Regions:
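Capsid-like jelly-roll
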Residues: 2-171
Length: 171
């Protein structure tokens, strides 16, 4: 008679992904001479630094979808607009050249070129998404980073409004 063996199967539980959404409402006054490169960043998702009051846990971020509207005031406009979703490790300094200094951290990008046809009510719509995933350690963050060329010598007020959605899973 043949011997039978009973095998035990072990199952590993899958991580559960949760959806997150955030409202973006940011404004900045751009100063400087004509043909200056200006830019700004908005934190999309952030893993805070761990201190004596908070405990930070590493987690994975994926499927980031960004929908924004950029509006300039003072009858002014900006040209050669570059949009990025970028990863920023803890302690990294942000400059207007961050995308060229660390191209390995670019998750998604879009070049808008010269969108201004008239400067009475310039507004720039943008939808940007990435399926790339990043594991965020303590102090890391994902940002929406934009930069543009300032065409006028006067100050320009820029407002960015929109929504961002992403998925997270604890590691």
């Amino acid at each position: 008679m043949a011997k039978t063996y009973k095998r035990r199967r072990y199952y590993r539980s899958k991580g559960r992904w949760s959806a997150n959404i955030k409202n973006i409402d940011d404004s900045q006054t751009l100063t400087g001479p004509t043909n200056t490169t200006v830019g700004n960043s908005v934190d999309l998702c952030l893993n805070p630094l761990q201190d004596s009051l908070t405990v930070s846990q590493t987690y994975t971020v994926k499927n980031i979808e960004l929908s924004t509207f950029m509006e300039t005031e003072n009858n002014a406009y900006v040209e050669d607009i570059e949009h990025y979703i970028m990863y920023v490790p803890q302690g990294m300094n942000l400059t207007t050249e961050y995308n060229y200094e660390h191209p390995e951290y670019i998750m998604a990008y879009y070049f808008q070129g010269n969108p201004a046809t008239d400067n009475t009510s310039p507004g720039y719509r943008l939808k940007l998404k990435t399926r790339m995933a990043r594991r965020l350690q303590t102090g890391d963050r994902i940002i929406y980073f934009w930069k543009a060329k300032k065409e006028l010598s006067s100050d320009i007020d820029v407002k960015i409004r929109g929504l961002v959605r992403w998925w997270t899973k604890a590691n």
